[in-house]
Amino acid sequence: MPFVNIYLPAGFTQQVKTRISLLVHESLMSVFKIPEKDYFQVIHPVMAEHLIYPDNYLNVPHTANLIYIQVTCGPGRTIEMKQALYALIAEKIAVSTPVSANDVIIVLTETGWENWSFGQGIAQMIK
């Protein structure tokens, strides 16, 4: 179960926010093979003055459309799967929204299953 936080400029329309959310989820389904209903995200609209970033980092230019995608998931994905996920998310967003691939920053954090509760105060993934 990935849990996704998406931080983006507050000025984005609801349509763009929803599209980005769906594109991230589609990418997770495609690469990580998660079920369709495994869809847990929070979208955080952020005022421009609160989005801090350099104009250029690692030879990648950034604009005011910069978004941060934070994915927290269970362990077990290979480096190749993670790289494929990053590429697919950036490509899908660049093709379908005003956000360029340069402006898609992704951070993925793996955490053990003992750190997850899907309700009822139970760590359901612990056998």
Question: Where do the language-model regions lie?
Answer:
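Interaction-mediating elements
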Residues: 1-127
